[in-house]
């Protein structure tokens, strides 16, 4: 004999099965309508995305046209002006707070920026291109003096020997009385010989031929005569021969 609860469960299951059996399946037209609605929804989404992309492309084209009409160095000038505005703002803030601006600026510099600045400062004697002969001569002098390595042991010995006179003042008589050592003179002579050897190696001046005829008064005139001979020599060969023989009319 079944319990009342089991009977109720069987009745519920029977009712559910009968209800499922009674509900009619979805028709083919409803399925087609659902698919069509999904396609239309997707099409609308794609259409909205296309319109948005078109607007963004148009905005980018307008911005690119504006950038092309600006001066070539506009970006650099803009960045420079923005930096100057920030610097002025910081200066005003420091002045209002009673803080030294340079000190506050140093506190904001990172370790990487400080190292990069130090490396930049260590680049001595940079080649900035030719400006005048005096600057070129000064740069050469700095380069040559840098190549001569000092004798630090001799320097320390001389420093201990002279004492306070090693750092002369306006009242000192030590200036001009120093006599260089023989090793220092030898280093200077060696460096001068290297300079002469290097200068001779890179010299483009051609040696003169002692046996050749001299038909010039200076080097500039010699170059002009060679150029004239190259272009007109074949036309003036007979005239030169007559002049040399003394038979010219």
UniProtKB/Swiss-Prot annotation:
Organism domain of life: Eukaryota
Main location: nucleus
Keyword Nucleus (UniProt): yes
Residue ranges of coiled coil: 72-100
Subcellular location field: Nucleus
InterPro entries for the chain: mRNA_splic_SYF2 (IPR013260)
GO cellular component terms, semicolon-separated: nucleus; U2-type catalytic step 2 spliceosome
Region (Disordered) residue spans: 1-36
Family: Belongs to the SYF2 family.
Function (record text): Involved in pre-mRNA splicing as component of the spliceosome.
Subunit note: Identified in the spliceosome C complex.
Name of the molecule in the record: Pre-mRNA-splicing factor syf2
Organism: Xenopus tropicalis (Western clawed frog)
Gene assigned in the entry: syf2
């Amino acid at each position: 004999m079944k319990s009342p609860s089991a009977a109720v469960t069987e009745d519920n299951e029977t009712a559910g099965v009968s209800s499922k059996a009674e509900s009619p399946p979805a028709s083919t037209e409803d399925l087609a309508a659902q698919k069509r609605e999904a396609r239309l929804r997707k099409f609308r989404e794609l259409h909205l995305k296309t319109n948005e992309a078109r607007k963004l492309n148009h905005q980018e084209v307008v911005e690119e046209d504006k950038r092309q009409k600006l001066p070539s160095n506009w970006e650099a000038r803009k960045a420079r002006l923005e930096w100057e505005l920030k610097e002025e703002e910081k200066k005003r803030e420091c002045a209002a707070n009673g803080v030294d601006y340079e000190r506050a600026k140093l506190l904001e510099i990172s370790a990487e920026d400080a190292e990069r600045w130090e490396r930049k400062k260590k680049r001595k004697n940079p080649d900035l291109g030719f400006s005048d002969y005096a600057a070129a001569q000064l740069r050469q002098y700095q380069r040559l003096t840098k190549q001569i390595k000092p004798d630090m042991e001799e320097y320390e010995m001389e420093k201990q020997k002279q004492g306070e006179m090693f750092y002369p003042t306006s009242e000192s008589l030590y200036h001009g009385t120093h006599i260089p050592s023989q090793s220092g003179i030898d280093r200077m002579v060696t460096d001068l010989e290297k300079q002469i050897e290097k200068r001779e190696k890179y010299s483009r001046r051609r040696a003169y031929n002692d046996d050749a005829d001299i038909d010039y008064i200076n080097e500039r005139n010699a170059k002009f005569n060679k150029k004239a001979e190259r272009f007109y020599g074949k036309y003036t060969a007979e005239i030169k021969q007559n002049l040399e023989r003394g038979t010219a009319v």
